[in-house]
Design a protein with these regions (language model features):
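Acyl-group handling in specialized metabolite and lipid biosynthesis
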Residues: 13-21, 44-50
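Short amphipathic alpha-helical segments and helix-helix/interface helices
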Residues: 29, 93, 122-126
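Conserved long hydrophobic alpha-helices within structured protein cores
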Residues: 30-40, 91-107
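Conserved AMP-binding/adenylate-forming core of the ANL superfamily
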Residues: 40-94, 111-118
Length: 128
């Protein structure tokens, strides 16, 4: 759903380019968070509905990482994530990385209007 007054993140920044010299994905995000760029999210009709700077992503992912570990998850545990192209997926994916958890991306439902039923089905499968 499009939101009014969503500003896109810039496409250029002043950070020096670093090619493949990061040892972890979180190290790369830590570096990118020093700049101004980020990710923009669009509807199927091309309207922006959310933006997330890498600095915001890093802060939110670190907060979520602490919350996930606070639920009793241990490093190395797997966390199922429905792989949708939205800010929550990216937040939780990076939260898992920071917490030492293994994000397991599950395919998103392709049926229009079937999201809730699909998530319920995944929940039953994961509990089995």
């Amino acid at each position: 759903m499009p939101q009014a007054n969503v500003n896109t993140t810039p496409t250029s920044h002043t950070l020096p380019f670093r090619a493949a010299d990061f040892t972890t994905l979180t190290e790369a995000l830590d570096y990118a968070a020093q700049g101004e760029t980020g990710s923009n999210f669009y509807t199927g009709r091309g309207a922006i509905y959310a933006s997330l700077s890498y600095a915001e992503l890093r802060a939110q992912a670190l907060d979520l990482a602490h919350k996930l570990l606070g639920l009793g998850l241990d490093k190395g545990d797997r966390v199922a994530l429905v792989a949708e192209t939205n800010p929550d997926f990216i937040r939780f994916f990076y939260a898992c990385q920071y917490a030492g958890l293994i994000p397991v991306a599950l395919p998103a439902s392709v049926k229009v209007g079937a999201h809730c039923a699909y998530v319920a089905q995944l929940h039953l499968l994961l509990e089995a």
